[in-house]
């Protein structure tokens, strides 16, 4: 069903396919369209045009065109007044020269009237300059804001429509880097600085026009140096762009480590892995540091050469001008006057000075162009499988068509050398149940991905009926399929919105009318009202009938998936937010939500990839019954390792190593006694029982069909349990990707953050000093050269004043020539000195900035990784926001030790030197001119305050948009499978709307003060000439004194204006410093002895937060000598829970553990079983001391850990989590993370652990073996392979206590047997506590604890529980394959 086009925030229309179509494109003139196409072309134009491609290659609309044109015209207009002033000042010089050098006695009143008239003209010109500047800064600020909004939306939209293979090969951290660092760089390079740059160029061109009109000879001589300016500008820009690209690559890798670490803090804490992750992070930063230094030196050489050329050209101008004035003085024919020469020298001197200020802008523009190219590469990329496209057949029905794989071969783009499917052929009959079973990594999930067309086969094809899958519209295909993935991915929305996502692309005609509401804000507004206290019925009624229909469909789907009871038990019900990746829900609860999302669309095809792996057997049985009911006329394809869920399938396909080994019904395959029969023998609980009586009793119970346990009674039991649960049963992950706007950017005490006093500037500076202290020598060198650069302007004023005075025709020709030679030489010497000072200044500050940046980032990450889970889970803290602390905030803070602080100090030095010199030379003139400086400074300070408030207010708002993008890319398979591109795009655009509107208002306010700061110097010129002329005519001072004081003060005021252009950078640095100091000021448990990087705090530096960091961090991925125990410990840990009560901070009204008491003896193998959400994983979270219980004791080896500080006890505990996490790094590094904190695992120990986990052969078969790089979250490995890698990581620790949370849920039966055998080897030497829903995993346990509603309701051996525990016995019956 077509959807009405709606204007997107980018000024474009979005069709129902999600494709953006510029709304104003057809009305644009042809010349503009051609220009746009020219600048949009890839690889056909030189890098010089990269900046113009950034401006014009993103489909700007009419408003953007108007803003660019008006801003450009106003920028050009802003540059013209200054050369006009040169003409007026030249005429004033002629008047002054006439009054002091004339042989005739003219009345002073005549000179004064002429001077006053010209001063009034200067005031008119200054008003024109202010108007032009305000217009061009405002227009270009809006251009920049609108451009980055278009880039954000286009980049996000492009990411959404790319095929999964693209995101698989996307460098980790790339998306975060693009939307945080690159967007900031682009905004800096396309806003008000563009107008200032245009004004500079306009000034330069106008100055030369005036110069040619006045004295063409001097102008022509100086014109020859213009190419040198552009050679240095663009040549330096090329190398800056080159080094920026290299730096970006290293920073992306480092950002990925930060992002994955902050997203999986439970793993970081469980293995005390913060030191190793910090060291790997530091390695990437060190790699980036040398390129950053080269970039800084290139920039300083570029800047220094511009100064050198400017000053050298002035030396040439003075020399040539002196010769021409000497000829005039000697009576030779000449049309040149002293005022004309002064005009040329003045405007070209000033133009050269202003042009030399262009270098920082060139650096900013080059960086913006480089960042734009990186974004445009993705934006322009054509997707091989575009889920938003309207191409392909949208009429075919999958309800009655046979699906067939024909000789399919496939390998993942991330590992092209590893075959996944090899000649796979089989048929999936319509309206039948086809089950696919096999070993981990055999290609089962890949088949599902091909059926969804997330990938295309390398060879062969997938057919639906007689049509190739490639001929069918992708959106229509995916809309006809309900998918439940092996690892269910939920978006950070409410439960209602997550389930309703299944309706977005539904192929059912009855759902089409719901689409506009699903894509709009209605559901989010509904859930927000419910969370604020409104009843669901009231809120639904207010939203209308369509929303009510969606809610009813959602409730029905949740009932089918056995999720409705735990949803109703939650305080906010369907409005409950699930958190980042569903972190607020247990694994079983997430799986039921994902199943509801698939069932709500009533699809003709169901793809179930381990859809019930995280569920207990009772829940699985209930859901299986519901699936059997809804799939009567549905084509169902299921992947399962629990063969009990596959045995009733119409056809079972057995796969191994990417090939189909056999297929048939359960009975047929068992009768063949082949691969499948072997799997059955391995998995059947009874045949593995150590007690024959257990199997006998179980069979007898099954024979009697246990009529007391009907589906209805089981459902009632489940409802009762669920109403008692409704709580988290997962180790909490970092908080939601969305962030409340009222939350502080970095609260340290969430419960009273509103009362937290605002940090003063002095406190921020004091807190930042330890970060800067190690680089004090470099900074001192930079400050000295900055002072030299600032004082050089005063030296220039002295030379200038004496030169102008020496050009008076009152002096003889020889005197004028010798003075011109002398002062020209002095100017050339000044050029050499300034060139050297600028290079040293840039290198010193550049190196100091990079070292400060390295130190700040490492210390920030260290502090973040040491915070407890409860801190990370507080409202207002999201992985995306915390990543920004380490990346953007650290970078902003480091600018205070880089070029920003250099410009600031040179400006201050210039100001003080100019003021002092002026008072020494002519204090009466200086005092009057100095009175204008507070006005200039006040305008700059006011702009600083405006920008600081604006920056702080909207820092979080754009972080939210970035977090949405990162979340979407992380969950791209779910978004593609359910065609949620439009929904994600709509949410993203809504997140941009508020900050965009506010930013546009801030533009008008902030740029008023910037324009005033720049323009007020012209008024100072007017006052200077008027007052100076008064003093000269009165005989108080000479022309030489006046022309020393004038440039000394006016260069100072111009420098202040330039300094205020850096106000946004200073504002960002101030806020960033406050955030980082807040972070580093948090006291940590065990601060007095903490130092995980291997260096204890010295007596001099006792604060561990600021321990000296190694410039060359250790290579954590290299093989090191180890002191890890060579064998497993001889004795396990004893564990006791005594009357433990606990509630998660995010759910204070829901008990997670309710008076839990269990006792585990050293060396025992114990198991925790029970329904999903009963509190099993919570026990592990408390055992690891991620949280402290509300009451009760947790005793490990006789020590109550709730009363102990620190977490040293974790050193001998290993955890295998329910969701297996890989970090950026090699396979060896990921497994080595499990080693104890004070040692490194050897290669032999890593391989031994992998053999125990049955993953060694898989790793060895990879081209790079153990050096294979894992992408973020290990996307290139299958679920079962990641699970075995997690087990290896735990075993390499040689723990005394091993915690297994569903550690074999994603394993095939053969791999599971290998792991069970490995665990048997370490049993009795290690205490093992396992959470499992597969009873064959734990039926040999020494003791099994039944956990229900946060309590232990029964315990005993397998045989004892089968005999007396009804729910346990029901699970055994359900999982038995003998039935």
UniProtKB/Swiss-Prot annotation:
Annotated keywords: ATP-binding, Cell membrane, Glycoprotein, Membrane, Nucleotide-binding, Repeat, Transmembrane, Transmembrane helix, Transport
Region: Disordered, residue numbers: 738-758
Ranges where the ABC transmembrane type-1 domain occurs: 69-367, 781-1068
TM ranges: 65-85, 119-139, 193-213, 215-235, 301-321, 336-356, 781-801, 820-840, 881-901, 920-942, 1008-1028, 1032-1052
Keyword Glycoprotein in record: yes
Pfam families (alphabetical): ABC_membrane, ABC_tran
First and last residue of the signal peptide: none
GO cellular component: mitochondrial inner membrane; plasma membrane
Protein location: Cell membrane
CDD domains: ABC_6TM_Pgp_ABCB1_D1_like, ABC_6TM_Pgp_ABCB1_D2_like
Induction summary: Expression is induced upon exposure to amphotericin B and the allylamine terbinafine. This induction requires the presence of MDR2.
Single biological process term from Gene Ontology: oligopeptide export from mitochondrion
Topological category with respect to the lipid bilayer: Multi-pass membrane protein
Residues bearing carbohydrate: 97, 552, 633, 989
Residue ranges constituting the ABC transporter domain according to the UniProt record: 403-682, 1135-1374
Any GO molecular function: ABC-type oligopeptide transporter activity
Binding site for ATP: 438-445, 1170-1177
InterPro entries: AAA+_ATPase (IPR003593), ABC1_TM_dom (IPR011527), ABC1_TM_sf (IPR036640), ABC_transporter-like_ATP-bd (IPR003439), ABC_transporter-like_CS (IPR017871), P-loop_NTPase (IPR027417), Type_1_exporter (IPR039421)
Coiled coil: none
Chief location: membrane
Similarity section: Belongs to the ABC transporter superfamily. ABCB family. Multidrug resistance exporter (TC 3.A.1.201) subfamily.
Role summary: Pleiotropic ABC efflux transporter that may be involved in the modulation susceptibility to a wide range of unrelated cytotoxic compounds.
Identification of the protein by name: ABC multidrug transporter MDR2
Taxonomic source organism: Trichophyton interdigitale (strain MR816)
Gene behind the chain: MDR4
């Amino acid at each position: 069903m077509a959807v009405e086009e709606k204007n997107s925030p980018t000024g474009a229309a979005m069709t129902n396919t999600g494709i953006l179509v510029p709304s104003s494109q057809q009305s644009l003139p042809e010349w503009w369209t051609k220009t746009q196409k020219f600048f949009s072309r890839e690889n056909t134009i030189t890098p010089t045009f990269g900046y113009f491609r950034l401006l014009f290659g993103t489909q700007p609309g009419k408003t953007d065109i108007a803003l660019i044109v008006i801003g450009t015209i106003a920028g050009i207009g802003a540059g013209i007044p200054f050369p006009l002033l040169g003409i007026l000042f030249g005429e004033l010089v002629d008047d002054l020269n006439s009054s002091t050098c004339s042989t005739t006695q003219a009345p002073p009143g005549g000179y004064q009237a002429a001077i006053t008239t010209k001063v009034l003209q200067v005031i008119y010109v200054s008003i024109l300059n202010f108007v032009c500047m305000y217009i061009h800064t405002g227009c270009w600020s809006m251009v920049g804001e609108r451009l980055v909004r278009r880039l954000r939306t286009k980049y996000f939209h492009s990411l959404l429509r790319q095929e999964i293979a693209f995101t698989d090969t996307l460098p980790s951290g790339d998306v975060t880097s693009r939307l945080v660092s690159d967007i900031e760089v682009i905004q800096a390079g396309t806003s008000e600085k563009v107008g200032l740059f245009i004004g500079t160029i306009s000034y330069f061109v106008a100055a030369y026009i005036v110069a040619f009109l006045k004295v063409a000879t001097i102008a022509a001589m100086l014109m020859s140096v213009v190419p040198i300016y552009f050679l240095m500008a663009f040549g330096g820009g090329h190398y800056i762009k080159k080094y920026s690209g290299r730096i970006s690559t290293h920073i992306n890798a480092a950002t990925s480590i930060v992002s994955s670490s902050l997203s999986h803090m439970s793993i970081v804490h469980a293995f005390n892995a913060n030191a190793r992750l910090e060291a790997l992070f530091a390695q990437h930063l060190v790699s980036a540091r040398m390129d950053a230094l080269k970039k800084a030196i290139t920039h300083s050489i570029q800047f220094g050469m511009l100064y050198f050329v400017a000053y050298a050209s002035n030396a040439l101008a003075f020399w040539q001008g002196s010769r021409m004035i000497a000829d005039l003085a000697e009576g030779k024919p000449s049309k040149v006057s002293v005022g004309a020469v002064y005009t040329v020298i003045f405007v070209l001197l000033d133009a050269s000075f202003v042009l030399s200020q262009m270098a920082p802008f060139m650096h900013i523009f080059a960086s913006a162009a480089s960042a734009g190219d990186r974004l445009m590469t993705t934006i322009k990329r054509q997707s091989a499988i575009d889920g938003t496209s309207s191409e392909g057949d949208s009429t075919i029905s999958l309800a009655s068509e046979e699906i067939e794989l024909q000789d399919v071969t496939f390998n993942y783009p991330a590992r092209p050398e590893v075959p996944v499917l090899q000649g796979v052929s089989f048929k999936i009959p319509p309206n039948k149940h086809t089950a696919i079973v096999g070993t981990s990594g055999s290609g089962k999930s890949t088949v599902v991905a091909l059926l969804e067309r997330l990938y295309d086969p390398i060879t062969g094809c997938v057919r639906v009926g007689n049509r190739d899958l490639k001929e069918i519209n992708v959106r229509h295909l995916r809309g006809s399929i309900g998918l439940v993935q092996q690892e269910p991915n939920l978006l950070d929305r409410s439960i209602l919105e997550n389930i309703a996502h299944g309706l977005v692309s539904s192929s059912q005609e009855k759902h089409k009318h719901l689409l506009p509401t699903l894509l709009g804000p209605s559901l989010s507004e509904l859930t927000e009202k419910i969370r604020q206290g409104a009843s669901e019925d009231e809120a639904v009624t207010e939203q209308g009938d369509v929303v009510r229909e969606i809610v009813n469909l959602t409730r029905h789907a949740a009932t089918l998936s056995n999720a409705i009871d735990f949803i109703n038990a939650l305080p906010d019900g369907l409005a409950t937010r699930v958190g980042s990746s569903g972190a607020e829900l247990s694994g079983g609860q997430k799986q039921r939500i994902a199943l509801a999302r698939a069932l709500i669309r009533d699809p003709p095809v169901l793809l179930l990839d381990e859809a019930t792996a995280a569920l207990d057997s009772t829940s699985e049985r209930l859901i299986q019954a519901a699936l059997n009911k809804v799939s009567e006329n549905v084509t169902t394809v299921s992947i399962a390792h629990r063969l009990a869920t596959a045995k009733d399938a119409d056809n079972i396909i057995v796969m191994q190593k990417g090939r189909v080994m056999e297929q048939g019904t359960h009975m047929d395959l068992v009768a063949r006694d082949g691969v499948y029969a072997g799997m059955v023998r391995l998995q059947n609980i009874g045949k593995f029982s150590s007690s024959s009586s257990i199997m006998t009793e179980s069979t007898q119970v099954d024979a009697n069909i246990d009529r007391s346990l009907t589906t209805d009674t089981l459902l009632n039991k489940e409802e009762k349990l669920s109403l008692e649960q409704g709580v988290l049963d997962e180790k909490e992950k970092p908080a939601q990707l969305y962030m409340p706007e009222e939350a502080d950017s970095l609260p340290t005490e969430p419960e009273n953050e509103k009362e937290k006093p605002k940090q003063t500037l002095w406190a921020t500076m004091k807190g930042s000093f330890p970060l800067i202290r190690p680089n004090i020598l470099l900074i001192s060198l930079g400050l000295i050269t900055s002072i030299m650069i600032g004082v050089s302007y005063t030296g220039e004023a002295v030379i200038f004043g004496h030169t102008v005075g020496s050009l008076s025709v009152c002096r003889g020709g020889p005197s004028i020539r010798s003075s011109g030679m002398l002062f020209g030489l002095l100017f050339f010497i000044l050029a050499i000195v300034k060139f050297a000072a600028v290079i040293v200044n840039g290198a010193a500050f550049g190196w100091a900035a990079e070292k400060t940046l390295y130190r700040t980032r490492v210390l920030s990450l260290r502090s973040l990784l040491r915070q407890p889970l409860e801190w990370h889970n507080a409202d207002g803290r999201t992985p995306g926001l915390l990543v920004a602390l380490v990346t953007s905030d650290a970078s902003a803070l480091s600018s205070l030790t880089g070029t920003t602080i250099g410009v600031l100090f040179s400006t201050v030095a210039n100001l003080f030197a100019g003021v002092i010199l002026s008072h020494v030379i002519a204090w009466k003139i200086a005092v009057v001119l100095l009175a204008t400086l507070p006005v200039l400074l006040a305008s700059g300070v006011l702009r600083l305050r405006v920008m600081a408030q604006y920056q702080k207010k909207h820092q979080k708002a754009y972080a939210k948009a970035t977090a949405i993008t990162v979340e979407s890319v992380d969950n791209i398979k779910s978004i593609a499978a359910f065609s949620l591109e439009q929904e994600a795009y709509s949410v993203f655009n809504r997140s941009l709307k508020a900050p965009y509107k506010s930013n546009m208002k801030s533009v008008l306010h902030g740029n008023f003060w910037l324009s005033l700061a720049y323009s007020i110097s012209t008024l100072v010129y007017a006052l200077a000439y008027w007052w100076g002329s008064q003093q000269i005519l009165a005989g108080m001072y000479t022309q030489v004194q006046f022309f020393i004081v004038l440039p000394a003060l006016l260069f100072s005021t111009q420098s202040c204006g330039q300094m205020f252009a850096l106000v946004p950078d200073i504002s960002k640095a101030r806020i960033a410093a406050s955030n980082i100091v807040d972070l580093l000021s948090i006291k940590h448990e065990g601060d007095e002895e903490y130092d995980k990087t291997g260096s204890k705090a010295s007596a001099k530096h006792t604060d561990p937060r600021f321990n000296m960091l190694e410039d060359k961090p250790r290579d954590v991925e290299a093989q090191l000598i180890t002191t890890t125990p060579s064998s497993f410990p001889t004795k396990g840990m004893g564990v006791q829970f005594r009357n433990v009560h606990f509630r998660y901070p995010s759910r204070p009204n829901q008990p997670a553990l309710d008076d839990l008491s269990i006792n585990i003896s050293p060396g025992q193998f114990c198991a925790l079983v029970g329904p999903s959400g009963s509190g099993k994983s919570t026990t592990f979270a408390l055992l690891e001391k991620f949280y402290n219980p509300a009451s009760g004791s947790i005793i490990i080896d006789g020590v109550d850990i709730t009363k102990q500080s620190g977490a040293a006890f974790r050193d001998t505990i290993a955890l295998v989590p329910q969701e297996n996490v890989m970090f950026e790094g090699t396979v060896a590094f990921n497994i080595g993370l499990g080693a104890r904190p004070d040692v490194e695992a050897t290669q032999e120990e890593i391989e031994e652990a992998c053999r125990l986990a049955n993953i060694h052969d898989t790793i060895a078969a990879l081209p790079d073996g153990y050096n294979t790089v894992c992408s973020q979250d290990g996307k290139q490995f299958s679920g079962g392979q990641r699970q075995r890698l997690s087990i290896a990581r735990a075993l390499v620790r040689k723990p005394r206590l091993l915690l297994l949370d569903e550690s074999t849920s994603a394993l095939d039966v053969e791999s599971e047997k290998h792991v069970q055998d490995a665990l048997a080897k370490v049993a009795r030497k290690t205490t093992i506590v396992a959470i499992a829903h597969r009873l064959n995993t734990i039926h040999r346990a020494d003791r099994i604890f039944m956990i229900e509603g946060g309590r232990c309701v029964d315990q005993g051996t397998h045989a004892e529980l089968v005999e007396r525990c009804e729910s346990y016995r029901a699970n055994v019956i359900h999982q038995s394959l003998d039935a």
